[in-house]
Amino acid sequence: MDDKKAGAGLSAEKQKALAAALSQIEKQFGKGSIMRMGDGEVEKDIQVVSTGSLGLDIALGVGGLPRGRVVEIYGPESSGKTTLTLQVVAEMQKLGGTCAFIDAEHALDVNYASKLGVDVGELLISQPDTGEQALEITDALVRSGSIDLIVIDSVAALVPKAEIEGEMGDSLPGLQARLMSQALRKLTGTIKRTNCLVIFINQIRMKIGVMFGSPETTTGGNALKFYASVRLDIRRIGSIKKGDDVIGNETKVKVVKNKVSPPFREAFFDILYGQGISRQGEIIDLGVDAKIVEKSGAWYSYNGDKIGQGKDNAREYLRENPDIAQEIENKVRAALGVAPMNSVPAAEVVTED
């Protein structure tokens, strides 16, 4: 009995000491710097923004890319990296968010961005001279708390100042990796606090002399691999033809890392030249998989009504009938357990810290 009392007394003393420590931390670092997971203040539902691809939203498990996190999108040349990020920018702008594009490659096509649905008049753009400048601008924008999405295109183009000012043949090993490591250490906390989504586009390089495993690696060292909550590997797997003309690419995205849902899921979609991700094509494919759209031979039907012979015609039908496309999409989302988009009011998404 006495032992029990002693144990209870010790527990009470610990509780008192913990309360004093928590009070001291809050006084020193501000309210919310530490809290219990059971308290209502902790965000349980992750706020997301759609990728513009229904299949990829589903593969990510939470309905899109998580806000307040670092995301890396990498792949070979002409695989659709910039197209995918511009689609995310367009989706964020639809929610009323403010977006910035750090164009380190100096290669952003404004007309193409506009065709993908980006409001280029409202898009903030920077074309920095050095990697340090690009990351300082990113840091300043994140700290402002008024930016919802920042895209850095690309990590490979974040050239350290010492390399730009040096001679062409100078060997400066690990300089870019150190720059990225320092920047991400500084950025991560602020990104979470301001609920800003930061997307790094990255390129692929080949490791020399690799006998086993993949010889592919991404540029900029290992820091980004650790700090990224989501890593997407995007690949072009085929061409889409209309007659003899190639009108787009068949694309595969693999969720290589995911801290907010199970990883290693894959999404397949079409990127049409000049139009971006074919959402109607995805709705058809996923609708067939979920048995919401019937496919008989080359014909596609919905609710017993034929919507087109061949995928091109069915895609065109859904483009001309957006209400039916939305209805099928909502049924697909319900069947796969993903919440419908825009279920959170825009004002709430933008103002929440």
From Swiss-Prot:
Keyword DNA repair on entry: yes
Nucleotide-binding found in the keyword field: yes
Classification via PROSITE patterns: RECA_1, RECA_2, RECA_3
CDD domains: RecA (cd00983)
GO terms under biological process: DNA recombination; DNA repair; SOS response
Keywords: ATP-binding, Cytoplasm, DNA damage, DNA recombination, DNA repair, DNA-binding, Nucleotide-binding, SOS response
UniProt binding sites for ATP: 75-82
Listed InterPro entries: AAA+_ATPase, DNA_recomb/repair_RecA, DNA_recomb/repair_RecA_CS, P-loop_NTPase, RecA-like_C, RecA-like_N, RecA_ATP-bd, RecA_C_sf
Localization (cell): Cytoplasm
Record Pfam families: RecA, RecA_C
Gene Ontology CC terms, in alphabetical order: cytosol
Stored SUPFAM superfamilies: P-loop containing nucleoside triphosphate hydrolases, RecA protein, C-terminal domain
Single GO term (MF): damaged DNA binding
PANTHER family: MITOCHONDRIAL DNA REPAIR PROTEIN RECA HOMOLOG-RELATED, RECA
Function: Can catalyze the hydrolysis of ATP in the presence of single-stranded DNA, the ATP-dependent uptake of single-stranded DNA by duplex DNA, and the ATP-dependent hybridization of homologous single-stranded DNAs. It interacts with LexA causing its activation and leading to its autocatalytic cleavage.
Protein family membership: Belongs to the RecA family.
Record's protein name: Protein RecA
Species of the source: Cupriavidus pinatubonensis (strain JMP 134 / LMG 1197)
